[in-house]
Swiss-Prot record:
Belongs to the JADE family. It comes from Xenopus laevis (African clawed frog). GO terms for cellular component: cell projection; cytoplasm; cytoskeleton; histone acetyltransferase complex; nucleus. Component of the HBO1 complex composed. InterPro entries: Enhancer_polycomb-like_N (IPR019542), EPHD (IPR034732), Histone_Mod_Regulator (IPR050701), Jade-1_PHD (IPR039546), Zinc_finger_PHD-type_CS (IPR019786), Znf_FYVE_PHD (IPR011011), Znf_PHD (IPR001965), Znf_PHD-finger (IPR019787). GO terms for molecular function: zinc ion binding. This is Protein Jade-1. It is found in: Nucleus; Chromosome; Cytoplasm; Cytoplasm, Cytoskeleton, Cilium basal body. A zinc finger (C2HC pre-PHD-type) spans 252-286.
Length: 827
């Protein structure tokens, strides 16, 4: 038996767990509706899914089933959608539709849709402009209110209707409006001014008095200028009044290219600058954008700077841009408007290529003369036929006549304007205003009489500002605000530029200070390094250049003392470097000095017998040079020279020990002439007569050998100790700074000026003497002090020079250079 079950939806099957189909409760309530429509519907069958399910305990091969590991598994419990009545499914039918005619459909324009009709777009909507126009612009003041109270009392006595404030304001505003409109029309028209125009007037642009059909001469009804239609770009002459561009805008600008105000002017592309049309035509760099409208004026920026710098020969003003005479070699400059005013010859030539050329001539090269000018010249020359007046004088006369005529027309215009202002009430019709406002004529007449009194009391000035002028004032205020903002931004830009320049200069200054500090730091580090090196070598720091600055004390040593100290320490440095040799070299040197001492003692005995020896030549030569200088200078020696001379007599024995050692390191020069025996004897006599006794006791003599202790040489002998000189040696010498490209040859000798009393002196080669002689002559400029050369010392070979340190020692070269530089800095 087939079980009949009602179909159910998927929700019902999920809730009760039934495996059969069932209809929803709503479907059961409307069974007839379902059967009547016979529309296909769908049901969710869950039995199909249940039949596919197996229990987990069933044993199956892995190939016979699928494992559902997806969380979407719960969706399978809802069943499968199946149609209830598949036979009633509608069939798909397709048919061909004929093409429709192309109809222009409405598309929204790019701009908004504006309603140009007078009717409001919506019922009850009133435009804001209409509301603004309906508001009365005149407000009663205290005087008006007082008069209104008085007139209302009279109206009450007369039995008339009283007047309210709003009606009075409307009537006064209408009076002002009618008066302003009719007065302006009278000023702008010929019949209002009543002035007849001159028939000989010329065009303000081309200066031609002739008019043609289609190119009529048009007059401005406000400024009274006359222009051709083509010259000013008037496409169509209006029937009524016509105003030029400047008068239409109500501005009185100044021309950008000349100093003249007024005239036929057109704006530039920006609209803020104005230029005369004649100036734009005659200046070659300037162009006109539209020749039909003759505006805007373009390419003003193309005018060269030299044209802007020209000085007008007629008005003597350097304003705007001038043109020059068309004659090739003439450079006379003048403004275009000045040339027209002075009557200069200005030609417009049409070429065969339909090009227009403009030719202008200065008063000297111009040939234009008017009959009245020639008549004046003839009368001024007492009947002569020739005219001797200058063109400039004739031009001045024409300008004077033109100015007188302009003054005449201007005075007539002013008189007429004054008369129109006095008769202002004649432009108001009381009857028309009464009908327009629907006010009784008597009331309007009372208000009219009061309005006349108020205007006359206000010097015929209007009681309210005209609407057009008010709008212009507002526009001008807005323009002024924009100009002020532009000026503010310009000033701000300039201030920022100043700040930028200031910061740049401050940064540059700080960088320079930083570089100077770095240089000072390097110099200080170098001085510190030199001081440390001097300290390591044993020099006392109080005698160094860094600590030996010149104080403000008057008893302090002078610059010459510093120079002498630098040279003295340089010589001591050479001695200290030689003292830093190995011990073996010291011992060998002592042995050599001992042998040379014995040799010198033997040679002394031979000198007593009149014999000479080449070995003792350096000693004899050095000692023999002292006496002639002493004989020449006498007792005028300074104190330090006396001490040095006494030291020379006591140190002769020590010098005789050092000389043979120097001869072993350097070959003897046989080119030097031997000294005279008399000088040798005098030199030996100064050394003392007990030299033979010293030779008998070698142990005692060996004790007088120099011993090295640090950087100083200490001599232990029986003679008194000699102090270090504290005063500068006269003519101590100078150091020559080598040039940039000059190279110092290795082994060359550095020379100084001759000094007889200086220790550590040696000989140089003949070639070196010759070169040094030229340098010393150039440095001394022909001056030779007494201490340098005596009467008997005329040969360059008699000069003694400082011996330079060995060039192979880099340390010696470095210290020598530092001492030389420090000596120069001290000087």
């Amino acid at each position: 038996m087939k079980r009949v079950c009602l179909p159910s939806s998927s929700e019902d099957s999920d809730d009760n767990g039934s495996l059969s189909t069932s209809w929803s409760q709503h479907s059961r309530s409307l069974p007839s509706f379902r059967h009547e429509d016979r529309k296909p519907s769908e049901v969710f069958r869950t039995d199909l899914i249940t039949a596919m399910k197996l229990h987990d305990s069933n044993q199956l091969n892995p190939e016979d089933y699928y494992v559902l590991a997806d969380p979407w598994r719960q969706e399978w419990e809802k069943g499968v959608q199946v149609p209830v009545n598949p036979e009633f499914i509608p069939e798909t039918i397709a048919r061909v539709i004929a093409e429709k005619d192309k109809v222009v459909t409405f598309t929204r324009p790019r701009k908004y849709i504006h309603s140009s009709g007078s009717e409001p777009p919506e019922v009850g909507y009133v435009d804001i402009q209409t509301l603004a126009d309906a508001v009365c612009r005149y407000d009663l003041n205290e005087m008006d209110v007082a008069w209104l109270q008085l007139i209302n009392e009279e109206f009450k006595e007369m039995g008339m209707q009283q007047l309210d404030e709003y009606t009075m304001e409307q009537v006064l505003e209408e009076f002002e409006k009618k008066c302003y409109d009719k007065m302006n029309h009278a000023i702008e028209t010929e019949e209002g001014l009543g002035i007849e125009y001159d028939e000989d007037v010329v065009c303000d642009v081309c200066q031609s008095p002739d008019g043609e059909d289609g190119n009529e001469m048009v007059f401005c009804d406000k400024c009274n200028i006359c222009v051709h239609q083509a010259c000013y770009g008037i496409l169509k002459v209006p029937e009524g009044s016509w105003l030029c561009r400047t008068c239409a805008l109500g501005v009185q600008p100044k021309c950008l290219l000349c100093p003249k105000k007024g005239g036929a002017m057109k704006p530039t592309r920006s609209g803020t600058k104005w230029v005369h049309v004649s100036c734009a035509l005659w200046i070659p760099e300037v162009s006109i954008g539209s020749p039909e409208k003759m505006e805007p004026i373009t390419k003003v920026s193309h005018i060269p700077s030299n044209r802007w710098a020209l000085l007008c020969s007629l008005c003597n003003e350097k304003v705007g841009a001038c043109i020059q005479c068309s004659i090739k070699n003439c450079r006379t400059a003048f403004h275009v408007t000045c040339a027209f005013d002075h009557g200069l010859e200005m030609k417009t030539i049409l070429t065969q290529e339909d090009e227009v050329k403009f030719k202008s001539y200065c008063p000297k090269h111009g040939s234009t003369k008017k009959p009245e000018d020639s008549h004046f010249c003839r009368s001024a020359s007492d009947g002569k036929d020739t005219c001797e007046a200058s063109p400039t004088f004739l031009g001045g006369l024409r300008v004077l006549e033109a100015s007188q005529q302009n003054v005449k027309h201007g005075s007539q215009r002013k008189l007429k304007l004054q008369q129109l202002e006095d008769d202002f009430y004649s432009f108001v019709d009381v009857h028309d205003i009464s009908q327009a406002l629907k006010i009784p004529l008597d009331v309007t007449e009372y208000i009219y009489q009061y309005w006349k009194l108020r205007r006359k009391a206000n010097f015929n000035e209007p009681l309210i500002t005209p609407k057009k002028d008010e709008e212009d004032n507002l526009a001008k205020k807005e323009q002024d605000v924009l100009i002020r903002r532009l000026q503010l931004f310009t000033h701000l830009r300039q201030d920022l530029e100043r700040v930028r320049n200031l910061t740049y200069m401050v940064t540059r200054r700080e960088k320079m200070k930083r570089s100077v500090c770095r240089v000072q730091e390097q110099i200080f580090n170098l001085y510190t390094k030199i001081s440390e090196q001097e300290k390591d070598l044993g020099f006392p720091l109080e005698n160094g250049l860094l600590f030996n600055t010149q104080p403000s004390n008057p008893d302090a040593p002078k610059i010459e003392d510093l120079k002498w100290h630098s040279a003295f320490f340089r010589k001591r440095l050479g001695s200290s470097l030689r003292c830093s040799m190995k011990d073996s070299h010291k011992k060998s040197r002592e042995r050599i000095i001992g042998k040379s001492l014995d040799t010198e003692i033997l040679l002394t005995d031979r000198k007593k017998e009149g014999q000479t020896s080449d070995v003792s030549f350096p000693l004899e030569k050095t000692v023999a040079k002292i006496k002639p200088v002493q004989q020449k200078n006498g007792g005028s020696f300074p104190e330090h020279r006396k001490r040095r001379d006494s030291r020379t007599q006591g140190d002769t024995k020590f010098d005789s020990k050092e000389k043979p050692l120097r001869q072993q390191h350097r070959p003897a020069k046989h080119t030097e002439p031997p000294e005279r025996p008399a000088e040798k004897k005098r030199a030996l006599s100064q050394c003392g007569g007990k030299s033979a006794t010293a030779s008998s006791n070698k142990k005692q003599c060996s004790s007088s050998l120099p011993r090295y202790s640090g950087s100083l040489i200490k001599i232990h002998c029986n003679r008194p100790s000699v102090k270090v000189p504290t005063s500068p040696i006269k003519n101590w010498g100078g150091f020559r700074i080598p040039k940039k490209g000059e190279k110092v040859q290795p082994g060359s000798m550095e020379t100084c000026q001759p000094n007889l009393n200086c220790q550590f002196l040696g000989q140089v080669s003949k070639k070196g003497r010759t070169k040094e002689k030229v340098k010393l002559d150039n440095d001394n400029d022909g001056y030779t002090p007494d201490a340098e050369m005596s009467d008997s010392e005329s040969e360059p070979t008699d000069k003694c020079r400082l011996q330079r340190l060995t060039s192979s020692s880099s340390l010696s070269r470095g210290y020598e250079t530092d001492f030389i530089r420090r000596s120069i800095l001290a000087s």
